[in-house]
Amino acid sequence: MINLSLYQTNSLSYTIIWMLFVIPSCVLSVDERQKHCSPTFRCGKQTDLYYPFWSPDREECGHPVFKVNCSGDFAEFTISTVKFHVLEMNYESRIIRLVRTEYLNNLCPWHPENRSINQEVLPFLQDTELGTFYYNCSGPTVDELANGYIRQLGCDEEVGGKSYFVSSPSHPGNRAILDGLSASCERNVDIPVSRSAMETTATNQSLEAIKKVLDVGFELGFNSDCSLCVASKGACGFNQSSKAFVCYCKDEPHEHTCGKMGIGIGLGCGFLGATLITVCLLCFFFQKRRTSHHLRPRDNNLKGLVQLKQYSYAEVRKITKLFSHTLGKGGFGTVYGGNLCDGRKVAVKILKDFKSNGEDFINEVASMSQTSHVNIVSLLGFCYEGSKRAIVYEFLENGSLDQFLSEKKSLNLDVSTLYRIALGVARGLDYLHHGCKTRIVHFDIKPQNILLDDTFCPKVSDFGLAKLCEKRESILSLLDARGTIGYIAPEVFSGMYGRVSHKSDVYSYGMLVLEMIGAKNKEIEETAASNSSSAYFPDWIYKNLENGEDTWKFGDEISREDKEVAKKMTLVGLWCIQPSPLNRPPMNRIVEMMEGSLDVLEVPPKPSIHYSAEPLPQLSSFSEENSIYTEVFIGSTS
């Protein structure tokens, strides 16, 4: 009698042995440049560098402009005669942080030149903006700008004479003043700076504060071609003949990504492919009954995640010291504090009840893996083992915003800090809606999901309810209402208000802003005082605006500037919570409103309670394109 099990085992063994001999001759004819450029290299104290940077022995592996000098602690490259230090290379988040060498702790270098960075290779991130230095100016002294920041530098006569540093030089409101200033100055130099670092000068306008802004450096993104090339197992390089990016692959160079092997290799390996398919089918058939942990169809979505660390569950237990330090609990799981082996503090979210639905995990990892922004929490890795699911992201020292909006701690944050937090959240949402290749709609914006670092820089977190859609699209189809009561847009509940879209996040943001300044919380007091449960929430906000009572929880003791900021936040919040999505501004417009002057902000139209089954009318021109947006599903809804 034939032992079928033994026969199958021996057959599989023979097949594997045969493949070990066939594969090397069939598919491992690797292009030497792919082998040469795949490893990273060290420069000074910095490790793991690759494209666009290159050292003398790796010329074909980088862009010609970015040859680095490794004689010091930091990698340094030169554009024309201008040198830049590479402060940080973060390939996980795809961020490069640079600083102009001659401006390190020096505002008045000798005859600086105006040189720009090729943004086709290293594009500016959303947090990067241009500042301008004006040197040897002969015109009248300029002390202030209505729509920006200007500071006289005090350079020596032989170096720079009467000189200035200006932020937001491209703002239309500054054009007349700066055109005159530029004409009277001998030299103008544009310097990229960090927008979030520049915000610190609002409270500290000293020259030392400007130096610190420059020393922090500015952030650039990676060339998207290189990211796609690496994801396809290629190595990034530069074609000297065509003067263009090239992806070195195992078979031959390609323009963007590694595609299929050549026809000859494909024909030679066709039989091997058929054999592999047969073996896989046999293994699947015999293993199906013997395992209880099957991969769900939606799990395959994680195969598209690249350059992310995948941790085992044992590693997660070690990182969190057996889950000994609980940071918080939510509807999707528990968050624990921990430390990576390099000492970095992290937060680890363990998703609960994964067996019932894995879409929350897929949503969060797929959404966060596509983001890289100062106001979006950084994803560092994930665990995907059996039924265990965990997400590892950066640790934020000040926790979530909601604890600072409670009665006990509300006075700890002044108007200026709350404004910076609200502006940062707006920029983060603007990035999700308009800055990513695939638009991300969060659907759960609330104080508990806004994390704060040690400088109270806000970061949007918790993407468990997020949806992805193509940028050209706007309308999402939802099979279930999602979000938190009090922050959910009305169209999520009822189609009479309009279609669900990224404008649903705008509504949640408006409720968040009103809560931050105390306007939302006062609803309870007003309703209780009037003994009416039918009063429409914004009614009393409009009444207070008409009566000039717009300081909310801050009282009358705050300064005139802070009162204007509180009123601006109120108006922006009211625009955001308009019942019809068509009447809400998009997030990029909200950022402009928050950054702009209060004088140009109009009081939004006062909505009325609308019970008709007809859609609400459009009251403003804030609506974006009318093309229908189809949802890009990242997980099965079954």
Swiss-Prot record:
Enzymatic class: transferase
GO cellular component, one term: membrane
EC number: 2.7.11.1
Annotated GO MF terms: ATP binding; polysaccharide binding; protein serine kinase activity; protein serine/threonine kinase activity
Ranges facing Extracellular side: 30-264
Modified residues (Phosphothreonine): T484
UniProt entry keywords in alphabetical sequence: ATP-binding, Glycoprotein, Kinase, Membrane, Nucleotide-binding, Phosphoprotein, Receptor, Serine/threonine-protein kinase, Signal, Transferase, Transmembrane, Transmembrane helix
Phosphotyrosine: residues bearing it: Y393
UniProt-annotated catalytic positions: D444 (proton acceptor)
Subcellular locations according to the entry: Membrane
Major subcellular location class: membrane
Spans within the Cytoplasmic topological domain: 286-638
Membrane in keyword set: yes
Reaction(s) this enzyme catalyzes, per UniProt: L-seryl-[protein] + ATP = O-phospho-L-seryl-[protein] + ADP + H(+); L-threonyl-[protein] + ATP = O-phospho-L-threonyl-[protein] + ADP + H(+)
Binding positions for ATP per the UniProt entry: L327, G328, K329, G330, G331, F332, G333, T334, V335, K349
PROSITE patterns in alphabetical order: PROTEIN_KINASE_ATP, PROTEIN_KINASE_DOM, PROTEIN_KINASE_ST
Membrane topology recorded in Swiss-Prot or TrEMBL: Single-pass type I membrane protein
Region forming the signal peptide: 1-29
Glycosites: N69, N114, N136, N204, N239
Residue spans crossing the bilayer: 265-285
Family: Belongs to the protein kinase superfamily. Ser/Thr protein kinase family.
Listed PANTHER family: RUST RESISTANCE KINASE LR10-RELATED
Protein's name in the database: LEAF RUST 10 DISEASE-RESISTANCE LOCUS RECEPTOR-LIKE PROTEIN KINASE-like 2.1
